[in-house]
């Protein structure tokens, strides 16, 4: 696979360059609701690229376009069969991993210094 291909970035830039009206989350509305100091520090484009899912950008929960292509590229780069992008940082991934890895009644060894999201992954399913 061509690791120089950037399907998700290209889709985001196509959306941003189309001069969209920001009526969705996040609430900063593409930088209009951001303190100017942040815009000056991060650059004017970064907040415009902070988008939720729209039909033009694909659907994270059922990717068929740019997100799917980007996940396939990531899997290829990592040498994995599959790769899934997630929200909420590693917390969501850790919780999902623990929930998926252990069946009911199974024991899991967790180090004391494990991130609290690992413990939440044990608590959530009961």
Residue ranges and their predicted role:
Residues 11, 72-73, 96:
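Alpha-helical scaffold segments in soluble metabolic enzymes
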Residues 124-125:
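Short, structured coil segments at secondary-structure junctions
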Residues 110-111:
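Flexible phosphate/Mg2+-sensing switch loops adjacent to catalytic phosphate-binding sites
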């Amino acid at each position: 696979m061509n690791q120089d291909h950037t399907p998700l970035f290209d889709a985001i830039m196509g959306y941003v360059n189309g001069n969209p009206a920001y009526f969705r989350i996040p609430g900063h509305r593409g930088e209009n609701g951001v303190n100017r100091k942040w815009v000056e520090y991060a650059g004017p484009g970064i907040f415009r690229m902070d988008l939720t899912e729209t039909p033009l950008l694909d659907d994270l929960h059922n990717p068929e376009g740019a997100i799917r292509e980007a996940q396939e590229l990531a899997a290829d780069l990592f040498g994995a069969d599959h790769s899934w992008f997630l929200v909420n940082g590693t917390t969501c991934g850790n919780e999902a991993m623990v929930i998926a890895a252990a069946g009911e009644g199974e024991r899991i060894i967790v180090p004391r210094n494990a991130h609290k999201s690992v413990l939440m992954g044990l608590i959530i399913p009961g």
